[in-house]
């Protein structure tokens, strides 16, 4: 189960990004860039793939916490409480960073999942 409100917000933020698809994952909704996990919604939180260069800095933010879906912390992923994100600009910066990181991987083919409308 996941928040449709958060999913819609991510869809709007990602609609202009080329190669974005969505599919169910971890009981939530995942957004992929050319087949590489970018971000998603699990419950009432946004899952963000930070990568190693931004992970520690992301955890210093009051709106972020470690991803511990299985009871163990998964490095390079954080949960973001969208209600605690102070501004739309910060939200878009978070989305831009996660798209940039996911885009740094080789494209997976074929890309499966439902295309994010744009």
Label each residue range with its predicted role.
Residues 1-118:
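Charge-dense, helix-prone N-terminal extensions
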């Amino acid at each position: 189960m996941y928040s449709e409100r958060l999913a819609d917000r991510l869809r709007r933020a990602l609609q202009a990004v080329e190669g974005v698809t969505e599919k169910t994952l971890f009981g939530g909704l995942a957004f992929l860039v050319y087949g590489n996990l970018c971000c998603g919604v699990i419950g009432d939180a946004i899952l963000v793939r930070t990568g190693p260069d931004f992970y520690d800095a992301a955890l210093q933010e009051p709106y972020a916490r470690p991803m511990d879906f299985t009871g163990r912390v998964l490095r390079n992923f954080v949960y973001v409480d969208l209600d605690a994100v102070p501004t739309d600009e910060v939200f878009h910066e978070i989305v831009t960073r996660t798209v940039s990181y996911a885009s740094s991987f080789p494209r997976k083919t074929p890309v499966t999942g439902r295309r994010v409308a744009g």
